[in-house]
From Swiss-Prot:
GO BP annotation list: chaperone cofactor-dependent protein refolding; protein refolding
Signal peptide segment: none
Designated gene of the protein: cbpA
Primary location recorded for the protein, binned into one broad class: cytoplasm
Protein name: Curved DNA-binding protein
Its job: DNA-binding protein that preferentially recognizes a curved DNA sequence. It is probably a functional analog of DnaJ; displays overlapping activities with DnaJ, but functions under different conditions, probably acting as a molecular chaperone in an adaptive response to environmental stresses other than heat shock. Lacks autonomous chaperone activity; binds native substrates and targets them for recognition by DnaK. Its activity is inhibited by the binding of CbpM.
Domain J: 5-69
Pfam families: DnaJ, DnaJ_C
Amino acid sequence: MELKDYYAIMGVKPTDDLKTIKTAYRRLARKYHPDVSKEPDAEARFKEVAEAWEVLSDEQRRAEYDQMWQHRNDPQFNRQFHHGDGQSFNAEDFDDIFSSIFGQHARQARQRPATRGHDIEIEVPVFLEETLSEHKRTISYNLPVYNAFGMVEQEIPKTLNVKIPAGVGNGQRIRLKGQGTPGENGGPNGDLWLIIHIAPHPLFDVVGQDLEIVVPVAPWEAALGGKVTVPTLKESILLTIPAGSQAGQRLRVKGKGLVSKKHTGDLYAVLKIVMPPKPDENATALWQQLADAQSSFDPRKDWGKA
């Protein structure tokens, strides 16, 4: 196996401390990350930097590497290498030396299986109005960069322009193939999963594909009937209130709910009778006339009965 100049790869000196090397690694990992860099050899450079960091970040491996690098031009290097404790290693042991330094990379690099990258999940808030049709959305997330030990070394910001399809529901998962972390040894990238979160609406409650809205009406509107303006997700409509309507009564408006691939839900207007403020003398007299005219009516007649 070729002994690479890891210091040159990292752009540092053999005398530099770990902090300096770590700073260089983070800068180069960000520069050559395959999902960020536009350079044609970015993936190869990224892996090379990661390999160098794996060795130089470990004090023991770095010391052994430095000793091997010092003797790289020695004619005896290919036949015999002297470890720090004076022990001699023959050519057949050379592979083992590399393995001890590089954590089996030297011996098994070509035998390691392709590993798929990690998936990433992010929550995407969506307003009810946005679910009615397909819309574009710019999303930003952090792409973790893993070191050779499987630990997150840093995070690289990434931005994508995506399409959110019509009819998405709360908790729905949308897969963006290959937008997760890069694979290893030729393995495929992980995926990015968008988790849809329907934001609460100040007027509408969601019940499956249907919507509910509380519609305040005056007592005389409930008694006499009439038309009131009611908002929907698209526009306002005139809702007919039947005469004799009761508080809590649900009036169905067909096709004004949420859309989906299978069908469109309905809107249900739930009537709420709202009393006017404290009445004046004239209003009180009218209420008294109504009470006298309906003296036989007992609203609690069936109260408590099954």
